[in-house]
Structures are given as structure tokens and as C-alpha cells.
Amino acid sequence: MPKRAGTHKVAVIQHPPVTLDRRKTLERGVELIEKAASAGARLISFPETWVPGYPEWMWRLRPGGDYKLTGEIHRRLIENSVDLKAGDLKLIQAAARRLKITVSIGVHERD
């Protein structure tokens, strides 16, 4: 039987984001990363579209109606989506670098 190279602790984050608020969600993400890393996690994984939140409301709006509400929510979603060229993930990247860990985080991306 081959020797094991070692084990690694993985953390799966199951904590909600601050929906439609990129900055506060990223700040919360850093707190969660620090907590998981302090417990020994080397790989930390966040849910799908964690930044700025999964658009679960889309399944609750009436098709062909709610235009004003739909437009406002969509505007906020786009406004708070991640722009990689603008460096929107710098907080997460800096935390990962400082703690020497790997982070997988789901985002809505815009360009």
C-alpha cells in the first residue's frame, strides 16, 4: 500500500452572505476564513454565487409582472457582482495569502 503524503483539513462554509452587499459579504468571508484557518483548515470552500448572494428570489417573482421590483433587485445584483479587473476580491486574496491557505468562493462576475 502506498504511503500517504499527509492529510489536509477542508472547511465547507455554510453561512449566509450579506445578500446584495459585496463589501459586507467579503468582510464576513474574511472572518469565516480566519475562523476556519485557525481550526486547521487548509482549503476553505464557499457556496455557489456566495458573493453577493444566490438570487433565490427569481423563483418567487411572477413571470411577466413585478417589473419595478425585478428591475431594482437585478440592478443591485449587478452593482454588487464581482469585477475581477477592479480587484473586488482583494480582501479574500489577502486573507488567503496571509494565512497560507486556499479559498474557493462562488461569485457573480461582471466585466
Spans of model-derived segments:
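Hydrophobic structural segments
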Residues: M1-D111
